């Protein structure tokens, strides 16, 4: 009979999840049936797929499907499938642990507020563990396709932190889950109730879901189950139906099925494509970002079918990585049933599907972003809040759609009082000053640092808008986004300041004159700061601050250097340029000290002031001091 009775403990996170579900999801208990039916559907899909390569797994054929039953006397509900089944090891691995990445992040988000936690758990996808919302004991009996009847397995738990595993004899391939209902859950011991839940959440599943027929027993004065089974769902692939025949409610229910989420999608597109390649696509934009959005190992949200036969779950070849948040189904009429991931990478049909699906997703985003309807614009704002940083990756990954992606970008800006990223590049160009020919931006590690940085002072004085870039991906993105509609993107904190036509001849002449007057100060400052600064120069970008640091042309910014170090990567060893404001009293005092041919005290005072101006500029841009104690000593000497 195989391995003996064995008792094991749940993974720690499972205990916590079970507790949360029992206490947080009581208001939406019926989702347990949706989740268990979805799992059963996946198991049958996997059998179909593995059966292509090994027909013996089908064990003589027979109709594939799901059966639901209940026993009012025993107070049990049963969900059975004849899918791929599980071995003993698979039962322990799949039912005793949470395999999905992002688990730690998930638990860190929980607030203790039942309403918020319920939504969060629904977003995360509770799967098999949802059974414990209504059951105080769950029994799972299973046998994997292709193994002897003697290698069946029984898994059982009361949801109390432990589970048992036994070897059993099981003639049928597949899995049967029996829920022993909690007190007060008799509502689910009703054929009408169970049917209504299936038709609400799982009507679209392309497998027949069956229950026993019922008839009225006059003697017992109640409905009695018959031996005959009846299909209670439509059992047709939703994506294969004409759009006109599918309601919004059905689209939403299908999204919840494939995404394992409780909420509604932000938008969807359903199309049949004919021509060089023939395929059907049903693609959804989620409302919320998953916890593992930034995980390099995370799975794609696309399911691939060939002629309605499930092929694979995470078909990442069908969309570029920057659209990895998209959920949905693609059903090809051209790919072979025995398609492998290697074939997918080389297939011309897959390339056509990828290009077509990318255009559809970008089209969905454009229709929301460009809409005059406030509700649609709000949808795009929601999308950008959750997925904007990922979309920016497309500028470096998808050259063919680079211009379309650039139009979809949104930024914070000095035009707005808050940190909301709502300004498009087209919005910015529409507000440019007469004579302005550049799009100005500043990058910083957060909105406060960007908004209050000294580099913005002359732009604020002249009323010129500056984009505030604070996402970690922005510096990388800018290496691919050099211009938009023939307007160059220019950092206000890089290189010499060139305001072009925003500056008149009189201003330029005055600047040249001042630079000549302060040349002795600049020359001496270069010598003193040779170890810290690449260059020292007089600037006209400052109106209130005495100094600022800028990156030289071709060098990485201080912001990017700090981000690289935080990520554990080596940043190029470059020095910033120190710029001094000739109109500021501190700089004028510094120039006066430079002109005095005094002794050691005057030299020390000059160097202290100069180093303090450099260090203050470094702090103002969000940097950290290499030697804070030295800075404090210099400030103390100046204050004494």
Curated annotation (Swiss-Prot):
It is found in: Cytoplasm. It holds the Pfam family HATPase_c_3. Gene3D superfamilies: 3.30.230.80, 3.40.50.11260, Heat shock protein 90, C-terminal domain (1.20.120.790), Histidine kinase-like ATPase, C-terminal domain (3.30.565.10). Residues 1-341 are annotated as: A. Disulfide bonds: none annotated. Residues 563-640 are annotated as: C. GO terms for molecular function: ATP binding; ATP hydrolysis activity; ATP-dependent protein folding chaperone; unfolded protein binding. Residues 342-562 are annotated as: B. PROSITE patterns: HSP90. It comes from the Bacteria. GO terms for cellular component: cytoplasm. Its main location: cytoplasm. Keywords: ATP-binding, Chaperone, Cytoplasm, Nucleotide-binding, Stress response. Molecular chaperone. Has ATPase activity. Homodimer. Belongs to the heat shock protein 90 family. HAMAP family: HSP90. This is Chaperone protein HtpG. The gene is htpG.
